Design a protein with these regions (language model features):
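Short beta-strand->loop micro-motif that forms the acidic, two-metal-ion catalytic signature
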Residues: 31-35
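Catalytic core of pol beta-like nucleotidyltransferases
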Residues: 1-12, 20-26, 36-95
Length: 95
């Protein structure tokens, strides 16, 4: 988590999926949503950076990156990805 915070300087990081719900299996990975400021440079808006900074951690992780405005604009839509993450996930980091 520290590596992601240093690399992205995110506003929020959420854990979502089976690990957040508590119904993970032996092959489950960590699913993370990284919410970056709208002003974040292009390289900090891509998941590729996450895989670079997490390389070597030996923890299976999927990372989705989005901007604050994209995330917040969809919160009111019950079936949207951000709404589901807020409802079922866990907030791990808030700046």
């Amino acid at each position: 988590m520290r590596r992601l915070i240093e690399a992205y300087r995110p506003e929020r990081i959420y854990l979502f999926g089976s690990k957040a719900r508590g119904d993970e299996g032996p092959d489950s990975d960590y699913d993370l949503m990284v919410v970056v400021p709208d002003e974040a440079p292009p390289e900090r808006r891509r998941s590729r950076l996450a895989y670079e900074v997490l390389r070597g951690t030996r923890t299976a992780t999927d990372v989705v990156v989005c901007t604050r405005s994209w995330f917040d604009a969809r919160l009111h839509l019950r079936a949207s990805f951000p709404s589901t993450i807020v409802r079922e996930g866990k907030l791990l980091h808030a700046a």
